[in-house]
Every structure is written in structure tokens, then in C-alpha cells.
Amino acid sequence: AIPCGESCVWIPCISAAIGCSCKNKVCYR
């Protein structure tokens, strides 16, 4: 998995728009 440089502790991954998803409080794709 590639980190998207975004955390998802309080809010969902905005980078989900480019295929990222939340894993262990960090957004990965």
C-alpha cells in the first residue's frame, strides 16, 4: 500500500476520490 499523506483519525479520507482508503488511521491506496 502507498500512503496518501493524509490521516483519517477524525475525518474520512478526502483522497478516497483517488482510490485511497483508511487503514490504521492513515489513508493508503
Curated annotation (Swiss-Prot):
<dbReference type="InterPro" id="IPR005535">
    <property type="entry name" value="Cyclotide"/>
</dbReference>
<dbReference type="Pfam" id="PF03784">
    <property type="entry name" value="Cyclotide"/>
</dbReference>
<feature type="disulfide bond">
    <location>
        <begin position="4"/>
        <end position="20"/>
    </location>
</feature>
<keyword id="KW-0611">Plant defense</keyword>
<feature type="cross-link" description="Cyclopeptide (Ala-Arg)">
    <location>
        <begin position="1"/>
        <end position="29"/>
    </location>
</feature>
<dbReference type="GO" id="GO:0050688">
    <property type="term" value="P:regulation of defense response to virus"/>
</dbReference>
<dbReference type="InterPro" id="IPR012323">
    <property type="entry name" value="Cyclotide_bracelet_CS"/>
</dbReference>
<dbReference type="GO" id="GO:0006952">
    <property type="term" value="P:defense response"/>
</dbReference>
<keyword id="KW-0960">Knottin</keyword>
<protein>
    <recommendedName>
        <fullName>Circulin-F</fullName>
    </recommendedName>
</protein>
<keyword id="KW-0930">Antiviral protein</keyword>
<comment type="similarity">
    <text>Belongs to the cyclotide family. Bracelet subfamily.</text>
</comment>
<keyword id="KW-1015">Disulfide bond</keyword>
<comment type="function">
    <text>Probably participates in a plant defense mechanism. Inhibits the cytopathic effects of the human immunodeficiency virus.</text>
</comment>
<dbReference type="InterPro" id="IPR036146">
    <property type="entry name" value="Cyclotide_sf"/>
</dbReference>
<feature type="disulfide bond">
    <location>
        <begin position="8"/>
        <end position="22"/>
    </location>
</feature>
<feature type="disulfide bond">
    <location>
        <begin position="13"/>
        <end position="27"/>
    </location>
</feature>
